[in-house]
Amino acid sequence: MDTVEISRFLTAMTLAVHIIFATIGVGMPLMFAIAEFLGIRKNDLQYIAMAKRWAKAYTITVAVGVVTGTIIGLQLSLIWPTFMEMGGHVIALPLFMETFAFFFEAIFLSIYLYTWDRFKNKWTHFLISIPVIIGGSFSAFFITSVNSFMNTPAGFELKNGKMVNVQPIEAMFNPSFIVRSFHVITTAGMTMAFVIASIAAFKLLRNRQPKDTVYHKKALKMSMIVGFFSTLLSMLAGDLSAKFLHKFQPEKLAAYEWHFDTSSHAKLLLFGVLDEKTQQVKGAIELPGLLSFLADNSVKTKVQGLNDFPKSLHPPMIVHYFFDLMVTMGILCFVISGVYVLTLMFKKFRKFSNHKWMLYGILLTGPASMLAIEFGWFLTEMGRQPWIVRGYMRVAEAATQAGGITFVTILFGILYIILMYTCAYVLIRMFKNKPAYEDVNRLAKKQGGEIEK
C-alpha cells in the first residue's frame, strides 16, 4: 500500500470508530429526554430511573467521543495537509461552531446530571435536557456541513489553485447540507433507539433479575416505538438523498446501482456480481424501473449511467454492496419494529410483543442499525472517490507524503482497540450487580415509599 492508501485506511478506521460515539451523542439525549418526559407525565419512576441510568452511561461515551473527534481534527491537518491548505479557511466556520455546540452540550449535560431532585417543579429539570439535545444535534449539523462541502463544494472562487472570495455561510449551507443532515439526525435517533431496545430484549431473554422485568419491558416498548418512527423518517431521508444524488452527483448514484448506460426505466439491482470489463451483472435481484422511480418519482425518469463519465472519475464499484447492506439492515429494522408496533395496536396480539421470538428479532436491531450507519458512511465516502473535494481536488493530491504513516496507523489501531475495550468495560462495570429496581426503590423512598423489597 502506498502513502495515499494508508492515509485513506487510517482516516476510514478513525471515522468508523468515531461514528459509533457520534451516533450515541445525537441519539441518546433524545432517548433520556423522552424517558424523563414519560416519567413525569405518567408519574412513573421506572421511566425516571431509565433517564438517570442512560444519562449516566452517556457521559462515558461523550468522553470517548471527544477523544476520537479530536483525533479526526488532527488527522485532517496532519494526513491531508494539502486539502487543509486549500480549503481549511472555507470549512473553519462549521468546525468552530461544532466545537461551540459541543461545549454548549457539555455545560447543560453537567447541569442535567447534578440537578436531579433540585427543583420543586419536575418539568424544570426536564427542560434542561432540551439544550443537551440541541447541542448534540447542532454538533452533528456542523460537522456534517464539512463533509457535505467536500461532496458539493460552494461559497468560493478558485484562483491559481486557491479558494478565494469565500462566502462562509454559503459554503456551510452547501447544496447537500440539508438532505445529509436530515439523514444523519434521523438515523442516529433510529440507531440509538434500537440499541437500547436490543439491550432490553437481551435482559428480558436472560431474565436474571425478575424484579427488573417491568423496567425492561417499558424500556423496550418506548425504544421500539421511537425506533419505528425514526426508521420511517430515515427512509424518507434516504429517498430524498437518492433524488439529490440524481440531480447533483449522478455518477455516485450510478455507481451505487452499477448503472452504466443512461436510460429511463432504470432497474434497481440488489447484490449480484459485476464483471467490470463487460459491465455485466450476474446473480442480482432486479427490480425494473425502481432506480428511475427513486431518482424522480417516475419510472420514465432518465438516469445517467457511468459511461457518461470518464472512467478515471468512477467511484469504486464496491459501493454497490455497501448500499445494499445499508438498505437491507434498514429494512430489517423497519420490519421488526413494524411488527412489534402492530402487536401493541391490537389487543389480542399484545401478548406476542414480549414473546421469545419477538425478543430475538429485536435483539438483532441494535447491531443491524449500527452496521447500517457504518455502511452508510463507507458508502458516502467511497462514493465521492476519487475526489476529496468534488471537482476541485483529488484524494491523491491531498494526502501527506511524509514517511512513517504505516507506524502511525498501527499505533492508532492499538489506541482504538484500547478505547473501545475500556469504554465497554466501564459501561458494563457501571451497571453490573446494580439492577434497575434498586434505582427505582431509591427514587420511591425519596417520595415516601418503596416499590420492591
What positions do the PLM features span?
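Polytopic transmembrane helical bundles with strong interfacial aromatic enrichment
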Residues: 1-453
